[in-house]
Amino acid sequence: VQPDAIINMAHGRMGDKMVDYLKAKNILLFAPLTINSLVDEWEKDPMGMAGGFMSQSIVTPEIDGAIRPFALFAHYEDEEGLRHSYAVPERLKTFVSTINNYLNLNTKPNSEKKVAIYYYKGPGQNALTAAGMEVVPSLYNLLVRMKQEGYNISGLPANAEELGKMIQAQGAVFNSYAEGAFNDFMQKGHPELITKDQYESWVKESLRPEKYQEVVDAFGEFPGSYMATNDGKLGIARLQFGNVVLMPQNAAGSGDNSFQVIHGTNMAPPHTYIASYLWMQHGFKADALIHFGTHGSLEFTPRKQVALCSNDWPDRLVGAVPHFYIYSIGNVGEGMMAKRRSYATIQSYLTPPFLESSVRGIYRELMEKIKIYNNSHKENKDQESL
């Protein structure tokens, strides 16, 4: 038997021998979650799962290499008040699509695969950011390697410096007050323009009505006030090279507290944030999603801690797309959140090495003179003692 994937519904580990087998055969391992409560209770629970049940359902399967801790089963009550565990219908549909999408990555030619890569960038001319990484050169190296592996990345510039210039021009992020820069971008930056009909069809496919109402209550009707055109469309910044698209991750909330906006607010994300991910799923039709560097805000959007339901933002924004996250090996805690809340398969990168620092210019000269002075003073004392 040579399976392409294994779906393990048992709790706990499968063991080291099984891990060796999975590695040798390059077999995907999925461990969907069984919720030990009624569907309605679970959907309202902000934790999703906790304690020993979480350990045996999520933590230990991760040791075996299981990915995508996707809540699939929950309890239903019959007419006599007896509980039975069944697959949640809407979850089952998404789970099957997800498995098929992962398997397609093994069979689809690289030249036909569509990949969406999100990066993190401050407003205006701010540089791309990621903890412990030079982002633009690293991103360029990835694109070059993908091109060598047969991916369609037409139009890739000759070097990382040129890529950086293109990102500043076409993949920018704007403050809400930067109207001049925004207007210039809409004319010259080649944004993806999303219409009301497109957006609402994607929303209908991905979000429950009450979930979308949270967005309208917070930010008004589509397109909102940010990145909106005069004719009622929404602009999404992106650079497209053949079948690969690079996109900035927009702010997941509003306000001046950037730490809180990134690390989680209680509000629904704005239209621009949602539209970007829904376009990735339904417009661009990505075969794979990559978040590049540590870290973004997707894994911190509301609501549940783990065992997400179809009413939680990360679950809806990732959809059934295989998700890969280039993440620092030095940030284990938040990396686990990315794995469990945004269904990311983590690809670790090393933290930068520590080097001994030296002082600069005139300060180095000053340090040398202080050292000479101290040594000469010590020599005089030694002579006096003799």
Language model regions located:
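An N-terminal assembly and electron-transfer interface module characteristic of large anaerobic redox
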Residues: V1-L386
